[in-house]
């Protein structure tokens, strides 16, 4: 995944035409599009190849099962044309290894959730988030998912993994996270959903957030 804008669109809409229109409108400002259950359950896996005309696709299925089932899920995900899959780490090393094994066969990537961005994410996942981050690095995952709503946790995770893994960070916009803060904290990409796809002009909303990120990099340099 090439880093240009450092922004990923979380396209959690349920209508095919709306999804394609938004993807086309904001493609200039995003490095990837993250799709999840709302869109896939409503439209089918076929939407992935259509969206891939505009940007690389990350399947946010938070895969969390036994190794054999994880392999089957990941096979279907990559056969559908996705470039990466998001999986849970709390299921353990063997389940994670199964996902990474299939991703390697397809030449694709795996992102592991260390912590989720909503308030409840601090209840059970945060206490084991650092252990999950270490496991993901040891297993050879491509990256981690860490919360933009808690930039200090992104900083902590970055210190643990160094530059071994990339960090993508959800929660910018509607959940209260600020793009510039989480980039400064150590994230490689921010994930933005409702602040873009629910905006009156998704393109303009994406442009403004991209400009905010660019300004943060200019300030750092």
From Swiss-Prot:
InterPro entries given in the database record: Aldolase_TIM, OMPdecase, OMPdecase_arc, OMPdecase_AS, OMPdeCOase_dom, RibuloseP-bd_barrel
Known catalytic reactions: orotidine 5'-phosphate + H(+) = UMP + CO2
Gene3D superfamilies: Aldolase class I
Record-linked SUPFAM superfamilies: Ribulose-phoshate binding barrel
Single GO BP term: 'de novo' pyrimidine nucleobase biosynthetic process
GO (cellular component) term, any one: cytosol
Keywords: Decarboxylase, Lyase, Pyrimidine biosynthesis
Active site feature: 62
Highest taxon listed in the record's lineage: Archaea
Presence of keyword Lyase: yes
Family designation: Belongs to the OMP decarboxylase family. Type 1 subfamily.
Cited function: Catalyzes the decarboxylation of orotidine 5'-monophosphate (OMP) to uridine 5'-monophosphate (UMP).
Protein name per the record: Orotidine 5'-phosphate decarboxylase
